[in-house]
Amino acid sequence: YYKYSTLRQEEKRMDSSTLPQGCCKETLQMKRLLYRLVNFAQPSNALSVGCPTSAHLYLAAAKQGMNFWHASSLDELFLDADEPVDFLYLHDVNNPGLLRQAFALCAERTTPQSLFVVQGIGYSPSMRQFWQELKGDSHVMVTFDLFDFGLLFFDPAKQRQHYKVSF
């Protein structure tokens, strides 16, 4: 994870005025976790839905050659036909409706190796409800509740299981 120092420098150079106000910002620990998760999953295609944040630097840097897209709204969410979604990061706690719709679009395009990450699953009653809906989705096999983040795995060979982990 030798890119951490380079990523920190790039993050400091980012103009904070270009990032929207009112969005939940990820901690350094969370950004590094996202980096490690992309590194673990080795996705060909990764998608981020929500407010633009500096976490995108970490997501995009974790795997060279990966296709990485960001969408702030459904209007910006363009997926090619039959293109799988290997990694999805949902992170707009103020708009669970957007996250719900993005999940519905992307859940049909998962592979057994797909990994979805949801930020702010404990942020509000509506986000807690959204997390419960995700855990009950028929595509989802294994979940990890990390309090701030939720991880969703889709491998049908796995036994359906939900874990709660202190992170």
Residue ranges and their predicted role:
Residues Y1-P112, G122-F167:
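A short alpha-helical cap/connector motif
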